[in-house]
Amino acid sequence: IDSTGIKVEGEGEWHASKHGGPKRPSPRFLEPVAKPWLDWRKIHLGIDEQTLEVRAVEVTSSDIGDAPMLPELLAQIPTDQNIASVTADGAYDTRKCHHAIAERGAHAVIPPRKNAKPWKAITAGAVARNEALRASKLLGRALWRRWSGYHRRSRVETKMHCVKLLGQRL
């Protein structure tokens, strides 16, 4: 599961917004109302790691976060189809995401946030997340990523890049 920005007009603003740098032209050249640098959408994808097939997709406005979309993406995959694991970045380290993944009987491969604290173990998602937190602290983040299979996420990032290239040309 991941998301990326798709520019509706122009280039580079998503990267500048996401990673810093100049986001817009000098204010003296702008009309007070026009904000063309904000004109982009987010595409949220659920991709099968083995086949690289896009299994779920949602397009939202730029103000929608990543984590709230995970349950909706999982809901697009038929319940009779097994999901072995869900790999996502730290933005998805939320109770709702872990709960949605556990409800589907899948294993969450989400790195705990750097300032993460254990959750009360009242749901299967919380128990699994606490185990990931414990393993991450025990092994260290780099070794945890290797041990958990998080490193395989790069295959999905490659597919995401392909989708982004296509989207910017539509």
Show where each model-derived region lies.
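Short amphipathic alpha-helical "interface-anchor" segments enriched in bulky aromatics
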Residues: 126-170
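Polybasic low-complexity intrinsically disordered regions
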Residues: 1-114, 118-120, 125, 164
